[in-house]
């Protein structure tokens, strides 16, 4: 029984020795094997990254080198460049959104106000007695006078100077209810 087991161990040892399972040094980030000559379907990598002993080459399979080193359809440098371009455009669009939100949140005077016949009244409390009054987010008295902040979904109060419907009303102060 012992001789059968020892014979099996010797055969397994020789099989691994011949196939190179135990004594093959890995190279190119464990993608390739160090050999004297590369086989069919393998390519030699650069000597600087091989880590093979003198006189041996680092051989990596074609499909592994194309995905790892960029030898396939796309170059790895192009992938990095494309990612950098996307990041800069994303940063630019984010900055534009932040700038637009900051502008929409601050009350500004209108140079060309909307002309309506309704009076420019504002109130601190929301009264739902008139259907022409704006929603509670802007607290404006007329829906036509709502600013761009309301259209964007911003919930800031709109100043009376920004809601004035005519230039004459913009120059005169408007009355506010204090109830």
Swiss-Prot record:
<keyword id="KW-0325">Glycoprotein</keyword>
<comment type="function">
    <text>Probable component of sperm glycocalyx. Likely protects and facilitates transport of sperm in the female reproductive tract. Probably released from the sperm surface during capacitation.</text>
</comment>
<dbReference type="GO" id="GO:0045087">
    <property type="term" value="P:innate immune response"/>
</dbReference>
<dbReference type="InterPro" id="IPR025933">
    <property type="entry name" value="Beta_defensin_dom"/>
</dbReference>
<feature type="signal peptide">
    <location>
        <begin position="1"/>
        <end position="20"/>
    </location>
</feature>
<comment type="similarity">
    <text>Belongs to the beta-defensin family.</text>
</comment>
<protein>
    <recommendedName>
        <fullName>Beta-defensin 22</fullName>
    </recommendedName>
</protein>
<keyword id="KW-0732">Signal</keyword>
<keyword id="KW-0964">Secreted</keyword>
<keyword id="KW-1015">Disulfide bond</keyword>
<feature type="compositionally biased region" description="Low complexity">
    <location>
        <begin position="105"/>
        <end position="150"/>
    </location>
</feature>
<dbReference type="GO" id="GO:0001669">
    <property type="term" value="C:acrosomal vesicle"/>
</dbReference>
<feature type="region of interest" description="Disordered">
    <location>
        <begin position="105"/>
        <end position="152"/>
    </location>
</feature>
<feature type="disulfide bond">
    <location>
        <begin position="27"/>
        <end position="58"/>
    </location>
</feature>
<dbReference type="GO" id="GO:0005576">
    <property type="term" value="C:extracellular region"/>
</dbReference>
<feature type="disulfide bond">
    <location>
        <begin position="38"/>
        <end position="59"/>
    </location>
</feature>
<dbReference type="Pfam" id="PF13841">
    <property type="entry name" value="Defensin_beta_2"/>
</dbReference>
<feature type="disulfide bond">
    <location>
        <begin position="34"/>
        <end position="52"/>
    </location>
</feature>
<keyword id="KW-0968">Cytoplasmic vesicle</keyword>
<dbReference type="GO" id="GO:0120238">
    <property type="term" value="C:sperm glycocalyx"/>
</dbReference>
<dbReference type="GO" id="GO:0009986">
    <property type="term" value="C:cell surface"/>
</dbReference>
